[in-house]
Amino acid sequence: MSSVVVVGTQWGDEGKGKITDFLSENAEVIARYQGGNNAGHTIKFDGVTYKLHLIPSGIFYKEKTCVIGNGMVVDPKALVTELAYLHERNVSTDNLRISNRAHVILPYHLKLDEVEEERKGANKIGTTKKGIGPAYMDKAARIGIRVADLLDREVFEEKLARNLEEKNRLLEKMYEAEGFKIEDILDEYYEYGQQVKKYVVDTSVVLNDALDEGRRVLFEGAQGVMLDIDQGTYPFVTSSNPVAGGVTIGSGVGPTKIQHVVGVSKAYTTRVGDGPFPTELHDEIGDQIREVGREYGTTTGRPRRVGWFDSVVVRHARRVSGITDLSLNSIDVLTGIETLKICVAYKLNGEITEEFPASLNELAKCEPVYEEMPGWTEDITGVKNLSELPENARHYLERISQLTGIPLSIFSVGPDRSQTNVVRSVYRP
């Protein structure tokens, strides 16, 4: 048995899709366990760039099983669209399995997400408006519709009718927005269910059987630890648990079966949406990193906020996710910057702290305490191992590993999977 979890150590967009794709080569099963199509993965495979939002990155390997776990919320329309996108590019999806326990995103979730964000105005969270939060709200309120319900027309119609009474009242009375008729949703979404029916199984059985048979299973997290609803910068977070602990809940695999946790990080920090960001850059260096690193959201196209590497954030991620291996991406983006900075602690009310505060008011007052390191000018995009890196680049990586307390296992010097280098295997016993 060999199981590896891939999590983002920052606010998402760390390059998890690329690393998951890279690690998928040696995995036999690849599973997602939380989130929905609010996550964006850009993957290069055989010279072609693909953008996925819902389906696991391992779909390009025909012999590997790809799982959409029970902890996810699935937009059936988006799923059918993504399947068609892959089929048009001659990518087989026969290796996909979808949990019958996953919850379903319906049009009223999308509408509620949109109108609630508009209502908040200046206090908005920065949601992707994909209906993720409202779907998880229904799940917690025990009125959600699951994939198993979607496949049974009678059950689907009954639950949909009951939910529409409440949702329409909410939309019309509170938001002064138009509600939905049952016929607007029922036939269309039941048909989506029929189109994906062949993929639907109890994925907990699939995953546990694979592990019991000694197969390599890779769990793919979406977003990042700092967007975790419990451990992140609440309320500027997602509605699920991207931390490694989310695997056991969102996949139906027990905690004793998780072996290694890979924390994926950029060599700097980015963030999409609102909320405090202690190391954020508002200068030419920030603009340079954004443009060189093409820091624009895969899902939204929004420019990402950019800042220096924050070891306080990544240490927090290591602790709450039990990270055993560090994968450091986008090192090449920093080439040409004369002096690099790493945040080693925060200054709060005149005192130094190395812990990440729970209070956003406190976080907003935190000033980063920086350690400066000399940069490098050499082209590193063709580097294949640590010894080939310029001395300053190697020292930068070593310092990040020291400050975060996570051994470096993978480093990446460009967007292509061939620019990903292994220092030590994450599939070790």
Curated annotation (Swiss-Prot):
Enzyme Commission number(s): 6.3.4.4
Protein name in the entry: Adenylosuccinate synthetase
Task performed by this protein: Plays an important role in the de novo pathway of purine nucleotide biosynthesis. Catalyzes the first committed step in the biosynthesis of AMP from IMP.
Subunit description: Homodimer.
Source organism of this protein record: Bacillus pumilus (strain SAFR-032)
Family named by the database record: Belongs to the adenylosuccinate synthetase family.
Top-level lineage group: Bacteria
Binding site for GTP: 12-18, 40-42, 304, 330-332, 412-414
Principal place of residence: cytoplasm
One Pfam entry name: Adenylsucc_synt
Alphabetized SMART domains for the sequence: Adenylsucc_synt
Positions of the catalytic residues: 13, 41
Pathway it works in: Purine metabolism; AMP biosynthesis via de novo pathway; AMP from IMP: step 1/2
Cofactor note: Binds 1 Mg(2+) ion per subunit.
Record: residues binding IMP: 13-16, 38-41, 128, 142, 223, 238, 302
Keyword Cytoplasm belongs to the record: yes
Recorded GO CC terms: cytoplasm
Gene3D superfamilies: Adenylosuccinate Synthetase, subunit A, domain 1, Adenylosuccinate Synthetase, subunit A, domain 2, Adenylosuccinate Synthetase, subunit A, domain 3
